[in-house]
């Protein structure tokens, strides 16, 4: 399975000089020019930050932006010494998950969908926002509304994609809130795996043991986990299917 699901203008290629202050990366373009790009991924990016690695960036010359360049992808070598392009722009994850929902690629997990809303307040105090709130079609046997939380996943060990790659209090809170929605609603954790070499998904216990424990508790309570795999190219992203849990 390798379905092209999102197209975009060809990205600009270069080489990573360094990433610093979490939000910034200096990149040398093929012309020799060095530019500073915005890095939307503020995490440690385990296994990705190799200086001299090939990268791809986008260009948006809006006067409202401080930096016209955004770091989108990096090329790494996996355990088989194969080149793998990894999507590192965390802001792109929701766009990908929304696209596969709209294309009915998750129908086996969530059924047919009537409406999709983004950033809907939820939880006891309504101070949290769920990435996607879905209502099912009237023909669905399960009439429950669906709450989907999206997590961008770039870390891999051998062929297992892992999340998180560091301690995430926010992620822990999201799992507890998803668990509280069950059984009145469907709670879904959608992992956006932004590299083609993952065959399985598991929680990143080594990075955040509490997250792993909460993940398994939520799973036992009825949370649905959907590890969504994608392959990144210079001008598009392809769908590689749903991966099993390890």
From Swiss-Prot:
Q: Which cysteines are joined by disulfide bonds?
A: none
CDD domains per the record?
A: SfsA-like_bacterial
Give GO MF terms, alphabetically.
DNA binding
Which superkingdom heads the taxonomic lineage of this protein's source?
Bacteria
Q: Which family does it belong to?
A: Belongs to the SfsA family.
Q: What is this protein called?
A: Sugar fermentation stimulation protein homolog
């Amino acid at each position: 399975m390798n379905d092209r699901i999102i197209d975009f203008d060809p990205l600009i290629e270069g080489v990573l000089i360094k990433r610093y202050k979490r939000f910034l990366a200096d990149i040398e373009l093929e012309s020799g020019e060095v530019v500073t790009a915005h890095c939307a991924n503020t995490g440690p990016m385990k296994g990705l930050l190799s200086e001299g690695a090939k990268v791809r960036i986008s260009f948006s010359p809006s006067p409202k932006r401080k930096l016209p360049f955004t770091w989108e992808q990096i090329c790494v070598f996996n355990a088989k010494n194969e080149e793998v392009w990894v999507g590192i722009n965390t802001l792109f994850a929701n766009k990908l998950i929304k696209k596969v929902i709209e294309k009915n690629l998750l129908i086996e997990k969530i059924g047919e969908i009537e409406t999709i809303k983004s950033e809907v307040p939820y939880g006891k105090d309504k101070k949290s926002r769920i990435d996607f709130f879905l209502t099912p079609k009237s023909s669905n046997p399960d009439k429950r509304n669906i709450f989907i939380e999206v997590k961008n996943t770039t870390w891999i060990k051998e062929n297992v994609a892992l999340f998180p790659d560091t301690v995430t209090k926010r992620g822990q809170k999201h799992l507890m809130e998803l668990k509280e929605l069950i059984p009145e609603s469907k709670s879904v954790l959608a992992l956006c795996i932004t590299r083609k070499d993952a065959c399985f998904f598991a929680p990143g216990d080594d990075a955040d043991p509490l997250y792993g424990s909460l993940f398994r508790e939520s799973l036992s309570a009825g949370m649905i986990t959907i590890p969504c795999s994608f392959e990144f190219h210079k001008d598009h992203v392809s769908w590689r299917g749903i991966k099993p849990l390890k």
